[in-house]
């Protein structure tokens, strides 16, 4: 079986190095090629990968991972290059924590959780280029909270009780790498490795890569989990510059799946006899959340402070108008026209990212703190607008009175930047602009695209 998917050209891969990259667009590729300690199931719960089982002590400060003994590294041709052991995770962690090697990328999770990790990172930073000569043995000698008690057992010691550490250890900061590969490529060479010279331990290897065009994967013939999963004979990702052409490609059988935008869905549903009505299905939410972040020190294009915006956004009542009054259903419909409010997420993380030791999903705990724990999707009203039914008349008056008194003029203009020459991005932004108009009134806040 072959499968053809797609990705936007603005999300082309920039780095093949799993330890170095911090881009989700890179990890969409490399997670098909590299395996770490754990993976996640379709519900966001941690499941075995290279680690077949794991446990922790009573206060969740010490975590033990037992590894499989049948994992090999292969090259781009699927030829076995080395056997994977616990040492490879030590080498990988030292690479991440070494400022001379990984240039501070992906350090936050180990630095925040592991004993001695932040100190070791600082040591390598202070050493400058000389730190490139350090090895995983130097990391262990420095007291970083990790040890390989044998070839297939890893033990991590956290600075504090960390009941969610298994989800942390699943992140790229803790991925393995073979010391032999780093020796073969050198520090600079490994940091800049690509699909032709990197080693793989995941389900696929790369058959072909043409930047901004296509990338094709074929099964890794020596994948340790081959008997446990189903794989495509070839999996191809086509890069598309404008999402408006995906439906045409799907109709031409040049794509096997596509995201159906609002306009395309309207076209399909307008014809009850359309064959595509039977092919519609709701897409599973991704683990990534999307937020609006306020800039509290915005500058104008000439570099001078945008005092009008900066004063406005510093006002509590002004900000609360966004929280309690911005109605986004029509904007969500650009992603999910049938059930737009399923796109609502009122938390920093997405549901399913992590669970505590009692099996409670993290965002449910946040919902309780925010007073949302009794609320549920109803398909009619955004959860955060239910308390006041989106009525911000009093807040708006308060904000305008307080801000007028300190010289703010109205409407306040909020800048919203999009990708140039991308018609889909422009259409989405235009709908968002109308949401601002409907929610705030153009006498109060105007969205500038």
Which stretches of residues belong to each language-model region?
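Short, well-ordered beta-strand elements
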Residues: 1-10, 61-66, 89-92, 154, ...
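N-terminal lobe/hinge region of extracytoplasmic solute-binding protein
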Residues: 6-58, 199
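Extracellular/periplasmic solute-recognition and catalytic clefts
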Residues: 9, 207-221, 236-303, 329, ...
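Aromatic- and charge-enriched surface segment that lines or borders ligand/interaction sites
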Residues: 52-117, 155, 246, 309-314, ...
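Surface-exposed binding/hinge segments that line
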Residues: 88, 95-182
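Gly/Pro-rich hinge or "lid" segments in bacterial periplasmic/extracellular proteins
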Residues: 132, 140-142, 150-151, 157-236, ...
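Append "and occasionally in soluble cytosolic enzymes with long acidic Gly/Pro-rich linkers
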Residues: 218, 313-439
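Periplasmic binding protein-like
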Residues: 250, 256-257, 416, 437-449
């Amino acid at each position: 079986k072959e499968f053809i998917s797609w990705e936007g050209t603005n999300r082309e891969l920039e780095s093949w190095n799993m330890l170095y990259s911090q881009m989700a667009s890179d990890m969409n590729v490399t997670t098909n090629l590299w395996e770490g300690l754990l993976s996640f199931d379709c519900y966001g719960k941690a499941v075995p990968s290279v680690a077949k089982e794991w446990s922790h002590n009573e206060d969740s400060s010490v975590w033990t991972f037992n590894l499989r003994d049948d994992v090999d590294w292969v090259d781009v041709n699927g030829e076995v290059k080395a056997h994977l052991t616990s040492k490879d995770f030590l080498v990988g962690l030292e690479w991440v924590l070494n400022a001379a090697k990984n240039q501070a990328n992906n350090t936050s999770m180990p630095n925040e959780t592991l004993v001695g990790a932040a100190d070791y990172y600082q040591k390598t930073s202070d050493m400058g280029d000389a730190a490139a000569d350090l090895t995983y043995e130097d990391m262990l000698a420095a007291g970083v909270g990790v040890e390989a008690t044998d070839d297939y057992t890893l033990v991590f010691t956290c600075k504090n009780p960390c009941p969610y550490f298994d989800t942390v250890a699943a992140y790229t900061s803790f991925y393995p790498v073979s010391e032999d590969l780093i020796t073969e490529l050198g520090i600079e060479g490994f940091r800049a490795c690509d699909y032709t010279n990197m080693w793989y331990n995941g389900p696929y290897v790369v058959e072909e890569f043409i930047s901004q065009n296509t990338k094709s994967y074929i099964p890794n013939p020596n994948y340790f989990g081959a008997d446990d999963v189903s794989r495509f004979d070839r999996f191809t990702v086509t890069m598309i510059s404008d999402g408006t052409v995906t439906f045409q490609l799907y109709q031409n059988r040049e794509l096997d799946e596509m995201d159906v935008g609002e306009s395309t869905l309207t076209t399909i549903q307008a014809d009850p006899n359309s064959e595509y009505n039977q092919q519609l299905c709701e897409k599973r939410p991704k683990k990534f959340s999307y937020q609006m972040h306020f800039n509290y020190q915005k500058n104008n294009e000439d570099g001078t402070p945008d005092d009008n915006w900066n004063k406005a956004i510093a006002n509590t009542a002004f900000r609360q108008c966004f929280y309690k009054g911005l109605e986004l259903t029509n904007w969500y419909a650009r992603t999910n026209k049938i059930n737009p409010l399923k796109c609502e997420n009122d938390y920093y993380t997405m549901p399913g990212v992590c669970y505590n030791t009692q099996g409670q999903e993290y965002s449910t705990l946040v919902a309780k703190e925010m007073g949302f724990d009794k609320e549920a999707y109803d398909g009619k009203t955004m959860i955060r607008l239910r308390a006041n039914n989106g009525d911000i008349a009093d807040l708006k008056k308060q904000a305008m009175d307080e801000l007028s008194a300190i010289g703010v003029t109205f409407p306040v203009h909020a800048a919203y930047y999009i990708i140039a020459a991308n018609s889909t991005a422009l259409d989405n932004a235009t709908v968002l602009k109308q949401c601002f108009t409907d929610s705030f009134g153009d006498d109060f806040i105007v969205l500038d695209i």
